[in-house]
Amino acid sequence: LETLPRHLIVIGAGPIGSEMSQAFHRLGAEVTLIEGRARVLGRDDPIASEIIGEVFAAEGIRLKLNSHAERLWQDEDGIHVMASGEEIVGDALMVSVGRRPNVLGLDLEKAGVAFSPRGIQVNDKLQTSQPHIYAAGDCTGSYQFTHYAGWQASMAVRNALLPGASKGVRAWVPWTTFTEPEVAHAGLMEAEAREKYGDAVGVTDWPMDK
């Protein structure tokens, strides 16, 4: 973009869609955020995502939740999005609905490496279906974060070249969504912890704005 859009339509209220929606709105653009789930940041803690949704609504970002983009077209009036029966017209569109690992064209079949549309299949030591071949980063279909890919790469090199294989623990991975306020996460979500540990889980809320 070379100029600030008058009305930006964003499809997908994950981390990138949420960050960009708030950033462009604060720069002065009208923003409509379309999300198929019932809340923004649907993979984050429900309490945190509820707070972000309330902040967005208070700032004037239009949230269209439980909605799916069914049709897109462009004409002299702008970019049209038909979302759950409503036509929304803007002059810029951002699609933020996730990424698929780009593994086609690598001839993985010839090497006997198993993969799916979600990425190359690896075990907790980052070995593929061919134990002497390792994979790391976004191509494994795991967390798509730069810091996580770097950590995986270092573990893959260590396991491939040195004795004593290390295992990766996904529950340790932290991430942050740079909205305002920020949403930071590390370890299990409450629902995941309760599923694993039952009534042994305790929850404490600390208001950080007081």
Predicted regions span which residues?
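General small-molecule cofactor/ligand-binding pocket signal
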Residues: R62-K64, Y134, G202-T204
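N-terminal Rossmann-fold NAD(P) dinucleotide-binding loop
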Residues: G17-S18
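Glycine-rich Rossmann-fold phosphate-binding loop(s) that bind the pyrophosphate
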Residues: I11-G14, D138
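Gly/Ala-rich phosphate-binding loop of Rossmann-like dinucleotide-binding domains
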Residues: S21-R26
